[in-house]
């Protein structure tokens, strides 16, 4: 199956996007600031990819995660880091909830000028195939 390319639209003036859902991965809201949200159509329940790195925390529900060529389960408390352009899909048979942060900092972005961020390159390199942390720590 061919993955759908999702075009992530950052809110004006923002360097990353924060998403939240409380029932369905199709019914998502973008958090714009304190008390401000905007509805967006989520693609999490389709096989898709985007150029942004994504960090997703599941706060409720459970299901099956498809990330690249790996298939596994997810449940509340799980954290998943997805590298750029990594195809993924979350399948649930009931309600789920969670938060996602999506960002894209190309090589030329000023964030890489900070010395403390250089070590993040190794983390993002490992996330090219996805990283999954299970449950509460």
Where are the predicted features?
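Generic protein-terminus/edge-of-domain signal
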Residues: 1-66, 72
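Residue-level detector of short, conserved catalytic/binding motifs and their immediate flanks
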Residues: 53, 78, 88
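Conserved GNAT-family N-acetyltransferase fold
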Residues: 56, 80, 101
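Surface loops and adjacent helix of pleckstrin homology
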Residues: 68-70, 92-93
């Amino acid at each position: 199956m061919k993955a759908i390319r999702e075009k992530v639209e950052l809110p004006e003036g923002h360097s990353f996007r924060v998403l939240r859902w409380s029932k369905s991965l199709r019914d998502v809201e973008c958090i714009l600031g304190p008390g401000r949200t905007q509805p967006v159509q989520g693609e999490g329940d389709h096989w898709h990819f985007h150029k942004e790195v994504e960090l997703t925390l599941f706060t409720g529900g459970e299901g099956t995660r498809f990330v690249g060529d790996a298939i596994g389960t997810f449940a509340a408390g799980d954290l998943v880091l997805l590298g750029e352009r990594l195809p993924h899909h979350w399948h649930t048979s009931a309600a789920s909830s969670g938060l996602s942060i999506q960002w894209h900092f190309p090589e030329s972005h000023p964030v890489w000028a900070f010395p403390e961020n250089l070590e993040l390159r190794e983390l993002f390199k490992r996330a090219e195939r996805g990283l999954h942390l299970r449950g509460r720590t």
